[in-house]
Amino acid sequence: MSLNAETKAAIVAEYAQSEGDTGSPEVQVALLTASINHLQGHFKAHKHDHHSRRGLLRMVSSRRKLLDYLKGKNLTRYQDLIKRLGLRR
């Protein structure tokens, strides 16, 4: 259920702060969001896949923690990221 290398590279290129940036919160949140969206499609077909659902909840929690960190460090970057990803907050 993971993303392929081309998709990851495209996401990293779009959200990176500088060349070769893979560790910034924006990149990490964007990658987690893509994985979460991919898993949501999986659960429409496989409603009783509880093992993968646990992984999904772990990813959502990790994304929430990264977003809280970014909100505390730089509010404008946080708001820009939320708008770009189309998250509800």
Swiss-Prot record:
- A GO cellular component annotation in the UniProt record: cytosolic small ribosomal subunit
Gene Ontology BP annotations: translation
One annotated GO molecular function is: structural constituent of ribosome
Q: Which Pfam families match?
A: Ribosomal_S15
- InterPro entries from the UniProt entry: Ribosomal_uS15, Ribosomal_uS15_bac-type, uS15_NS1_RNA-bd_sf
Q: Which residues form a coiled coil?
A: none
Q: Which UniProt keywords apply?
A: Ribonucleoprotein, Ribosomal protein, RNA-binding, rRNA-binding
- How is this protein organized at the quaternary level? Part of the 30S ribosomal subunit. Forms a bridge to the 50S subunit in the 70S ribosome, contacting the 23S rRNA.
Q: What does this protein do?
A: One of the primary rRNA binding proteins, it binds directly to 16S rRNA where it helps nucleate assembly of the platform of the 30S subunit by binding and bridging several RNA helices of the 16S rRNA.
Give the family from UniProt: Belongs to the universal ribosomal protein uS15 family.
Q: What is this protein called?
A: Small ribosomal subunit protein uS15
State the organism of origin: Vibrio atlanticus (strain LGP32) (Vibrio splendidus (strain Mel32))
Per the UniProt record, the lineage of the source organism begins with: Bacteria, Pseudomonadati, Pseudomonadota, Gammaproteobacteria, Vibrionales
